[in-house]
Amino acid sequence: MMSKLGVVLTICLLPFPLTALPMDGDQPADLPALRTQDFEPERSPWFDPVKRCCSQDCRVCIPCCPY
C-alpha cells in the first residue's frame, strides 16, 4: 500500500517540482530598515530639494542622485 502511495506522489509531483513555486528568497532585496519606519527623504540632511534626490549616503537616503 505504501509503495502505491509513493508511486502516486511521484507521478503527481514529477511534472510540478517544488522549485517552480516562488520562494521568499527569490524576491528582490530591499531596505528592511526603511520598510519598518516611515521614511521621508525630504527630511534627510542629504536630500537636495532642487534635484529631488539624495546627494550623499545613498544607503539610508533614497532616491539617490546619479553622479
Curated annotation (Swiss-Prot):
Intrachain S-S bonds: C53-C65, C54-C61, C58-C64
Record bears the keyword Coiled coil: no
Propiece span(s): 21-50
Main location: secreted
Signal peptide feature range: 1-20
GO CC term, one of those recorded: extracellular region
Keywords: Cleavage on pair of basic residues, Disulfide bond, Hydroxylation, Neurotoxin, Secreted, Signal, Toxin
PTM annotation (4-hydroxyproline): residues: P63
Listed GO MF terms: ion channel inhibitor activity; toxin activity
Tissue: Expressed by the venom duct.
InterPro entries referenced in this protein's UniProt entry, alphabetically: 4Fe4S_Fe-S-bd (IPR017896), Conotoxin (IPR004214)
Compartments where found: Secreted
Notes on the domains: The cysteine framework is III (CC-C-C-CC). Classified in the M-2 branch, since 2 residues stand between the fourth and the fifth cysteine residues.
Family from the record: Belongs to the conotoxin M superfamily.
Protein name in UniProt: Conotoxin VnMMSK-03
Organism: Conus ventricosus (Mediterranean cone)
